[in-house]
């Protein structure tokens, strides 16, 4: 009996979550943001992370190149 109630509760929760997601999708598509296609401005932290990625890739390249 408890297992059936638990299963019904899970089904109801999943159904409500799907309906809520569909509602938000429809609501957001009716009022699109004017800056949807613009990339976010590059911040100082983003530049730092991008530089770290470049350094990491170049060091990996040098490691592979030296091991061959």
UniProtKB/Swiss-Prot annotation:
Virion surface face residues: 22-68
Pfam families in the record: Chordopox_A13L (PF05961)
GO CC, alphabetical: membrane; virion membrane
Annotated keywords: Late protein, Membrane, Transmembrane, Transmembrane helix, Virion
Signals that turn on the gene: Expressed in the late phase of the viral replicative cycle.
Residues that span the membrane, as ranges: 1-21
Protein's membrane topology: Single-pass membrane protein
InterPro entries: Chordopox_A13L
Subcellular location: Virion membrane
Function statement: Essential for the encapsidation of DNA into immature virions (IV) and the subsequent maturation of IV into mature virions (MV).
Family statement drawn from the similarity comment of this UniProt entry: Belongs to the orthopoxvirus OPG139 family.
Protein name: Virion membrane protein OPG139
Native source organism of the sequence: Variola virus (isolate Human/India/Ind3/1967) (VARV)
Gene name of this polypeptide: OPG139
């Amino acid at each position: 009996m408890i297992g059936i109630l638990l299963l019904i509760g899970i089904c109801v929760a999943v159904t409500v979550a799907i309906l809520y997601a569909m509602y938000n999708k429809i609501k957001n598509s009716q009022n699109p943001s004017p800056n949807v296609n613009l990339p976010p401005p590059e911040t100082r932290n983003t530049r730092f992370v991008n530089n770290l990625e470049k350094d990491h890739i170049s060091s990996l390249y040098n490691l592979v190149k030296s091991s061959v």
